[in-house]
């Protein structure tokens, strides 16, 4: 047989992993489900313990399950989330020595596109504006609470990606947003113990810019909304980077953020 025509046969462990993966992505296994013991799973699939162990390792490497140790441990299902993408992205960026401003530039290119799509949604007044307005109202109420107002502001930006209506862009932009969120959250936590936090006037100015974005989305002004987002990012990132410096993208920060969702 021509070697070029030979197709590698999947290992048995890969076939078992594929069946379990299908159960997860189809929703038959949901986030937080505890899989049966490996011995019981092996009997279900008719495979040996080493084969079952390897199948579990495959799924663990994909982030679909987490093996927890201890008396009440086991393999716990984790449905893929945008936070998983952010962790993988952070790993690649950190390995290549990429600094946080690089992520900022990417956000300046991609977030306005999300905002434009939000403004173009026919159901924006029902599906988009109320969510953004609710986050904005809570941020206004918490404007004197250093860490809380930063967290709500980051939720606002993440919502712009989440609500854009395009699944692929939502994942790409959402991962970038969470890369930035992890670093900005860390900076905010440290700054809350010193003089590094922006004064009240600057916080109100940032929230006024959020309000303008909401207003233009509600009006269906796609280009105006995108421009407002672009201008706001330029201002807010300049301030954040001035305070945070020029750090390399940090994987542990991403893992901490991911764990907060589990």
Regions found by a protein language model. Give the residues of each.
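Short linear motifs at protein or domain termini
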Residues: 1-109, 113-116, 120, 247-250, ...
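A ubiquitous short alpha-helical element
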Residues: 4-5, 95-102, 118-123, 140-144, ...
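Short alpha-helical segment immediately N-terminal to, or the first helix within
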Residues: 45, 215-216
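Conserved amphipathic alpha-helical segments that form helical-bundle/coiled-coil interaction surfaces
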Residues: 103, 107-190, 209-215, 224-238, ...
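Short, highly charged C-terminal tails/helix-capping segments
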Residues: 195, 245-258
């Amino acid at each position: 047989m021509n070697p070029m025509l030979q197709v590698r046969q999947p290992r048995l462990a890969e076939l078992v992993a594929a069946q379990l993966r299908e159960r997860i992505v189809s929703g038959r296994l949901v986030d937080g489900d505890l899989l049966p013991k490996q011995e019981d799973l092996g009997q279900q699939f008719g495979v040996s313990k080493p084969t079952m162990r390897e199948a579990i390792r495959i799924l663990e490497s994909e982030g679909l399950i987490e093996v927890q140790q201890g008396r009440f441990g086991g393999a716990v299902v984790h449905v893929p989330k945008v936070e998983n993408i952010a962790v993988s992205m952070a790993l690649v960026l950190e390995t290549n020595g990429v600094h946080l401003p690089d992520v900022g530039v990417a956000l300046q290119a991609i977030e306005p596109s999300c905002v434009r799509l939000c403004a173009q949604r026919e159901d924006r007044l029902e599906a988009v504006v109320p969510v953004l307005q609710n986050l904005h109202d809570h941020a206004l109420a918490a404007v004197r609470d250093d860490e809380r107002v930063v967290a709500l502001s980051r939720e606002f930006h993440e919502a712009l990606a989440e609500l854009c209506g395009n699944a692929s862009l939502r994942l790409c932009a959402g991962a970038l947003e969470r890369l930035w969120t992890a670093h900005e959250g860390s900076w905010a936590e440290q700054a809350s113990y010193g003089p590094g936090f922006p004064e009240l006037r600057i916080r109100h100015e940032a929230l006024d810019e959020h309000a303008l974005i909401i207003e233009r989305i509600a009006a269906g002004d796609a280009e105006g909304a995108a421009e407002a987002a672009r201008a706001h990012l330029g201002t807010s990132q300049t301030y954040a980077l001035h305070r945070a410096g020029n750090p390399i993208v940090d994987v542990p920060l991403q893992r901490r953020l991911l764990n907060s969702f589990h």
